Amino acid sequence: MTVVQKNAAGNEEHAFSTKFGFRDIAIKNGLVYINGEKVLFKGANLQDTHPMTGRTVDIETMLNDVKMFKQANMNTVRTSHYPRQAKMNAMFDYYGLYCMDEADLECHKSWEDGGESRGITNEDSWKAQYVDRTVRMVYRDRNFPSIIFWSLGNESGGGKNFGHTYAAVRALDPRPIHYEGASRAGTAHSDIYSEMYPLLTEVDDHANGKTDNSYPYYGNTQGQPYFMCEYAHAMGNAVGNLQEYWDAIESSKYGIGGCIWDWADQSIYDAKDIKNGNFEVDGMNKYRTGSDYPGPHQGNFVNNGLVTADRAWSPELTNVKYVYQYVKFISFDAATKQLTVRNNYDFIPLDGFYLRYAVLADGVEVENGVVEMPSMAPNAEGVVVLPYTATAADGIELMLNVELCCKEEQSWAGADYVVATEQYTLAERDTASFALNGNGELVLENVSGGYRVKSSVMEMTFAANGTMNSWVVNGKDLIVKGPEYDNYRWVENDKPTESLGDYNEKNGIQSKSATFTLAADRKSVNVVINASGWFCKYRFNYTITADGALLIDATYNVVPKDARRIGLSLVFPADFEQVEYYAYGPFENYVDRRGGSLLGRYYTTVSDMFEPYPKPQSMANREGLRDLLLFNPDEGYGMKVQTRGDVAFSLLHHSDIELKRAGHTWELQKGDVYAHFDCAQKGIGNGSCGNVATLDKYLIPQGGEYGCSLLFTPVTGIESGIGEVTDNILRFNVVDGKLVCEGTLEVSDSLAVYNMGGVKVAEAAVAHPTDALEISLQGLPHGSYIVVVKKASGTFVHKVLL
């Protein structure tokens, strides 16, 4: 559209062109409709932030943010807590994001006073300033069709000045008006019933028009659209139980969605480091937080992002993408091979997508294929038949992965981009007890007040109470510290309960004893360890065989009501660097944040399991461990671990205590390999802001009993992975902005690098047989990436840390 301004004489004074759009917005029966379709708003709060330029954000970063929102299945931006540059509103229009445009108005003193009758929000002398800050936003932005809501401000109480701003905005524009403080103060300055950091019980109450006793004025009794303007506080290792929030919203009477707090970490580079070009330490961004500067600050509290300060995708965002996905895979009937699909897009049919499926046997892909999607209308269900032929063999776990992919390139992603995923179990894992086959005889000796178990190839030594002091096989030291009960975890979401006893940096064991028994046939030694303490009673039943294998049958009885983890830890040598595992992955996941993680066989290193959270904390967990190979890649020896029961694991070059005590990621020094094998771990939750505790179903119940089995088998001469599924070991290193892949590579092999959202960022094909291949990763933000290697022997998925 071209706009021309003329003077009184009819002469043209000024002309400009602008894009413009038309759409209808209506609130009906407590829900929001756009062009006649009910819409749920799946979003995040977006701040102006850049690690180099602070609050000045360049066009490239704006475009990147908008595209990443789309890639993560988000459709809504709340401009917390001020309007964006007008050019970014134009990006929302072009790429297709709904916007809650928020006025630059925030005064916490009024908010903290509880609102309606106190502070400047209620003083006549401030009326003009309140109205001015709001109406100038409307005047500037009202021609952007992407703006669906006006927001009057943030955390400023609910005084009468918001009544004036509401009236002024309503006189200018008919769009819905939002103000969270109105809900908090029980006033009528909002068309939306809005909350911050609600409990799930509050979502259920207020999204269904119920009242509660949290505040005397709380309760969505008018049946307004219910919106979580801030929720799922993404500080550090966070965003637990997001699925439950959306189950509640989608099943409610008035729920219309919410915006996660928030999009990007707000770390910055120090001015001196910028001047000196000193941006990294050992490959880690040298970011600063409030703790690095004098004066009032909130430490790390502004690092609440779903992406890093330089916009690297996080494991949290991958879970968000899964929960927000528009296409739901409702069920799969293995007998008929029929997949029931629901299209929850509001305006898009599914003929622009195709379905890709893969069958995995014990984590290894054995079959794949592609199926065309029918033209399924928005908000309709349909059935797709998957023509795979693979069948399960005895004891083999069989899984089915499905992915919905874009047929053509989008403005925000390339062709083949995956917008929705799901996984189904076709055959359960083997649960039979382990059969130990150690050949040779053992000797059990009492030495120096402890015990020694040895054979012709191995030796273990123990203290009298069962503590393992050494484990040597074929002359190789396999441990730095033997298995011990461990309950310690520290993430920022646990801070509200940090005063509880389980935050003691020791494991709280008060008594521990052991019995040692050599079997009559001398083929095994049995060690039974019983211990009790403040947090847990446990029994470890060790079975040791002559080849150096160790079977641990563990039973735990939990004492406290808020335990963080129940399991064991041990420390391996620092050069046990290479990792192959069969569990949920390839990125970090937890019991309440596993969406988008798929059970499969993955490859990485201990160094690459690290996640660059600005404030170091416990991390790297993988749920559902089946088996694991941890080894020294230079000398080809290490440890194989197999499990029975529910086991989660993590491997890092840092202890949890080291992570807690460190102020910055870039201050950490790599050490030995710290391994956790947990029977249970508390969910991550959302506790770093608001009284949002981990859901009961993701807690470790007080008095609960847990059990699992771990079989540790020393291995040597490693040239292939577990099950001999690889032809060779591939090793990845990042050197001068290049990813270097080392190993045997043939002409038929190819490599592709993806961020954790599935965006392909680099690829290379092998032109001739080689033992090294380089891929440039220049310009990519530091973070975790997925390398998919396709060889004649199969497809292998590696996680690397750039």
Predicted regions and their residues:
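A short tyrosine-centered beta-strand micro-motif
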Residues: 1-2, 398, 785-788
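Short edge beta-strand/loop segments characteristic of extracellular beta-sandwich folds
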Residues: 338-346, 555, 738-744
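Intrinsically disordered, low-complexity Pro/Gly/Ser/Thr-rich segments with frequent PxxP/GP/PP motifs
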Residues: 363-396
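A short beta-turn/strand-edge loop motif at beta-sheet boundaries
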Residues: 346-353, 560-563, 743-750
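Terminal connector regions
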Residues: 3-5, 12-15, 390-430
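Beta-strand/loop-rich accessory regions of lumenal/periplasmic or secreted enzymes
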Residues: 387-395, 410, 424-717
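Extended substrate-binding grooves/exosites of carbohydrate-active enzymes
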Residues: 12-340, 346-351, 356-364
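C-terminal outer-membrane/trafficking sorting elements
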Residues: 724-802
